[in-house]
């Protein structure tokens, strides 16, 4: 029955979304067409608003009778004929999806999100789906297809538009162009300009005007002041107009959309704040009638707020942590509107919905490309946080550089700026390539660089930037306290750090193409370096003895395998529990996951009180400095065996 219901909803959505935005393709995810573009460029380099070509008519969404009515007393009824003169628009906005396409033990995918959006839209008068940037880069399946699998999904869903974010540039402009060609919706960014022509770049539009049952909604898209966050070599041919220049562009575009018949103006901005108030990223003058509602992104904060002029601003957390939803009631007789609902819908809500088949269909379509995500690399015996992983990568940078160039150059260090993404740690258990690609999605190649001594000290050896990780070899350690400020030294870093102008690095040579931090880490895991378990059982009594002789809050480097009976589960989300050996010895377990990283609460067959389990984890001695509580525990364990 569930499958029949899902098919009926999909059919209804195919009909209904034609009223607002592009027609979703529910039959063949590979059958897509290019977005409509406008060639009539203005003198300032911008282009006129494009009009969505979708048929606004549909059997379930008849065109509204919007002409010839008045409602001077604003009672939502025509003063003459008495019919209702209000309709509602429901906006569903995604920002910073970061390619989280397939559900994992740590993040939601679009399987349940698809069903949630379809069911919600089927019940709405005028549903509109839009995206506010950073949609592609981050998840393994999206990264391996360079965003195409996400764009294909957005085609299927009938998105009205997608604003470009800074991470859309991580692979270079050519891949933005590839996605623009595939998309049935326009990529928006009113303020991205070509450095050589001083005109708006060809692969995105300023706005789109969509028709909804006789009414028209304009959507303006812009990227925020985040140019410096992009690797310099990826944006060397473009620049962003920000500040007062961006305000002027948006005002002019709003006026053009109003002149073209727009009843409402939506601003989709890849920039945002923390939610306390609207910050400097947004010019409040735009709330003086130029925009009616703002959907934001980039900062990965969840908020719904109203600015001083009463305009709503919404953002969801990012990494598929949720979506923004706003319902706006519009009176087409007098042009007045009000936001009747504005909310952040968490992924915990839509993850419970039935999986939509489109995800499996698209994975099948791209199977020759995305298969690498499931490549098994080996076993990680204990959870490793992002800092530990980045320390290891810095050492791997150094080792790779010394092996390649060490005979010719005295290499001081390896490392540089390293950003780790969600979930921010590597789970214990079996590791696949996709696990690494999710944490380290960036395609920055290794380079040998020269650097002046003073910059070596300030930018690397003694930097205060906590995102810089370095490893010095024996030579580097021998000279690090005696650096000549005017001397020339050599380091191994990656192209993100080498292209960052303030580092003042000179590239000498580049390592093999398409070898990135995650690839070095993958080979390291394949060599068995993360499998530190002996596989032998250690008694609970011995675990308690070993832990009692450890310093406060210390953790072993090795993982230990323990068997015992569960006598208590005191946290049903993470699986915190107490084990007994039947001889009076009790052991605390802080966290249990499956071998594939699935968290305790998401396991299909959870260990319960009375079960016998074999777990593997490092030993940790946890001492609370405030209370003096002293606990010996297995820290973030992996379930090896379960006996009911």
Predicted regions and their residues:
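Sec-dependent signal peptide recognition
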Residues: 2-10
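C-terminal motif of bacterial Sec signal peptides marking the signal peptidase cleavage site
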Residues: 16-19
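Intrinsically disordered, low-complexity serine/threonine-rich repeat tracts
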Residues: 27-64, 70
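Catalytic centers of hydrolytic enzymes
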Residues: 88, 100, 122, 238, ...
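OB-fold single-stranded nucleic acid-binding module
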Residues: 535-644
